[in-house]
Amino acid sequence: HNLKYESSLVKQGYFDFESGKVAARKLLNMQNLPSAIIASNDDMAAGVAFEGYENGFSIPEDISVVGFDDSPTASHMWPPLTTVRQPITEMAARATELLILQLQGGDVSSQEAAYTCELVIRSSSGPPKVQG
């Protein structure tokens, strides 16, 4: 899609609702409003959506919001959150195996794991608003 990385669009968060609100406030006050905000987890995305509504933005008509994790928050908020589902159970099992191996004196430095994630499309995302 030829999207250029713009560091001004990256905001620090702390994986909670409040830091999602703070980051959204900064992004929503920019002169060139982004068409979408992707948060590092669903709690932050919920904060983004809340801040958007508090400032008169409609989601997804004015701005799309996407989270990560597919936590219960994603399907319980309004509009339901588009998010990325990752295989938490598989990841936790593998992390546990590696921890046990390391505790037993094994070398885990060369261990790799890859997981398939799934985009769960719900109502918080849509095509960008036509400018002009």
For every predicted segment, state its role:
Residues 1-132:
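Bacterial carbohydrate/catabolite-sensing allosteric modules
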